């Protein structure tokens, strides 16, 4: 007698890849033409409790405020205005408490975000890129994390790309007989 296979798929996303992919997908919401960063906060039960991306504050027009990186006057740059992904993920949390949670983030946090992460009680930061490693902000963030006991580590992906194919839901699974 033949039966339809009931063996699970082997090519599913493991939790770390899933959470980092959610951070990267969230980053696609950013309107910043130069830097798209996303963050995903996860609790000990592998439940997402917060997602954020870099953008202007709620109620402030991202069509009016500047997106440039440099200008003669700092007020003509994005830096005094933009909210980082980490801030937005903490503020957008769907849980009353993120204490003890982990944060997956595309870019290693700056010192200002490190302070927010520490104050929120997040205990682990997993980042993809540390391209500003030698900056004063990243150095201060590492110092703060070390002092507060927040662990941080670089994410090592098992694959370099994850493809989202909206048409795949319409295909019928092949029926393999044993």
Swiss-Prot record:
Its cofactor is Zn(2+). It holds the Pfam family dCMP_cyt_deam_1. InterPro entries: APOBEC/CMP_deaminase_Zn-bd, CMP_dCMP_dom, Cytidine_deaminase-like, dCMP_deaminase, dCMP_deaminase-rel, Deoxycytidylate_deaminase_dom. One of its GO terms (biological process) is pyrimidine nucleotide metabolic process. SUPFAM superfamilies: Cytidine deaminase-like. The active site is at 86 (proton donor). Homohexamer. This is Deoxycytidylate deaminase. It comes from Homo sapiens. The gene is DCTD.
